[in-house]
């Protein structure tokens, strides 16, 4: 990887506050692109539009999904946009490349019953459960990203206003409220989780050694909770974010409020959460439609 690509990744990390997971995706995209350059004996600074079209064909020949191809092309377009800010002689070969539209999908989310089962798993006040519960509570109660969670400092928690200040994408701060259950889990954690009482830093969420937890560590914790919970097959940080948004909208929250809570710049990004479960659809239908039920039915 050359110095331009390394500087590009560093800019995404420092200035745009991208998560480890997102940065890894960008890095993988660049590595694959570099393999193509080497294979075709091409150079980054002389790469042309026709080469970009050939690269698009190359990705299709590797049987990648449209979403993956779209992301990889977007990564390279953004790379060249960054490079153009440093060198006026650089031309973006991907700027006019028509790449496939992303496949539409409905975000996965957990049912309320599944969430209750997960919280039941970590309700006993062991040292590990104190930490695991605060992770689960914060992700579900606030809908924050895992990259935002691992960077929360103890001073970011406001018990007076019942909320937390997080640093989101683009280094933008936002305040997100939390409820009584989340507050209680944080208080219990701060009071009884021994590693946090003896650590020499301000990070809120720690591993069992008293070190600031990583994004990978959070995923490991959630996977472990799932293994201990009957009837729940999968949970990950972004699924909890989907669940947070879906449950709010299902209970009548307006889209603009959810947009603000999630830290989305565009309302269209939040719009993908407006799906509701079949159970919720049926409940609304039965309660709202005048001919949904006969008079003797309840």
UniProtKB/Swiss-Prot annotation:
InterPro entries: CB, DNA_brk_join_enz, Integrase-like_cat_sf, Integrase_catalytic, Integrase_recombinase_N, Integrase_SAM-like_N, Recomb_XerC, Tyrosine_recombinase_XerC/XerD
Stretches assigned to the Core-binding (CB) domain: 1-84
MF GO annotations: DNA binding; tyrosine-based site-specific recombinase activity
Pfam families in alphabetical order: Phage_int_SAM_1, Phage_integrase
Residues annotated as domain Tyr recombinase: 105-286
Subcellular localization(s) per the UniProt record: Cytoplasm
PROSITE patterns the UniProt entry points to: CB, TYR_RECOMBINASE
Gene Ontology cellular component list: cytoplasm
Protein's UniProt name: Tyrosine recombinase XerC
Species annotation: Staphylococcus aureus
Gene assigned in the entry: xerC
């Amino acid at each position: 990887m050359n110095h331009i690509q390394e500087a590009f990744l560093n800019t995404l990390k420092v200035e745009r506050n991208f998560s480890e997971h997102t940065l890894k995706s960008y890095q993988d995209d660049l590595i694959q692109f570099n393999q193509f350059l080497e294979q075709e004996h091409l150079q980054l600074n002389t790469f042309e539009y026709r080469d970009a079209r050939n690269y698009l064909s190359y990705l299709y020949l590797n049987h990648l999904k449209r979403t993956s191809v779209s992301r990889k092309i977007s990564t390279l377009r953004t790379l060249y946009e960054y490079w153009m800010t440093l060198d006026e002689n650089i031309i973006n070969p991907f700027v006019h490349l028509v790449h496939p539209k992303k496949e539409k999908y409905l975000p996965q989310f957990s049912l309320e019953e599944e969430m209750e089962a997960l919280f039941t798993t970590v309700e006993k006040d062991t040292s590990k459960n104190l930490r695991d519960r605060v992770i689960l509570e914060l992700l579900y109660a606030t809908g924050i990203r895992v990259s935002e969670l691992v960077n929360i400092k103890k001073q970011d928690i406001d018990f007076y206003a019942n909320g937390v200040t997080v640093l989101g994408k683009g280094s933008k701060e936002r305040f997100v409220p939390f409820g009584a259950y989340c507050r209680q889990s944080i208080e219990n954690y701060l009071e009884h989780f021994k590693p946090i009482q003896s650590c020499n830093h301000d990070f809120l969420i720690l591993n069992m050694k008293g070190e600031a937890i990583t994004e990978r560590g959070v995923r490991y914790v959630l996977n472990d909770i799932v293994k201990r919970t009957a009837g729940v097959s999968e949970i990950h940080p972004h699924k909890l974010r989907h669940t947070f948004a879906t449950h709010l909208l299902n209970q009548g929250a307006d889209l603009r409020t959810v947009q603000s809570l999630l830290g989305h710049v565009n309302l269209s990004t939040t719009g993908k959460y407006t799906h509701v479960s079949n159970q919720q659809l049926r409940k609304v239908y039965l309660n709202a439609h005048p001919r949904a039920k006969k008079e003797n039915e309840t």
